[in-house]
Amino acid sequence: MEKTKETETDNKTLIYHSCYGTDAKVSLDIQMYYSNGNICIELNDEDYKEPYGCLTVNLCDATPNYCSYVDVNNMPEAEDFIVENKLGVFTGLVKESGFVRYPLYMFDAERLRDLCPDGMIVYEKGKGIQAVQKQKEEKR
């Protein structure tokens, strides 16, 4: 039987393929950067129950809702991870900081709600987006 690369192990656990040849089972922890309200997405290692890395980076500029710069400096596979797991799309915009060009991604709110519902409630409430969530619940 041929072994295929898994990208998702259950509803809330994803596989992060490292450039070092290892795979980690990770879950998302969604928060908000205090200085500008941008979405912050951290990865937690499910096997070791500790932080794995931060998918996003705070470059001080406020971005549109659900958008954040991706930390390709410390997590070079971050863009592949986002695409493989259908977490968001590249906006075409980048910001330079030092010698690094950080891509701006718009994250899929529905997908993030599925993977980290509590974090998204806090993020959306902090951004004043809770009306969208209420409208969705009313349709059910």
List each model region and its residues.
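Acidic, aromatic-enriched beta-alpha/helix-loop junctions
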Residues: 38, 42-87, 91
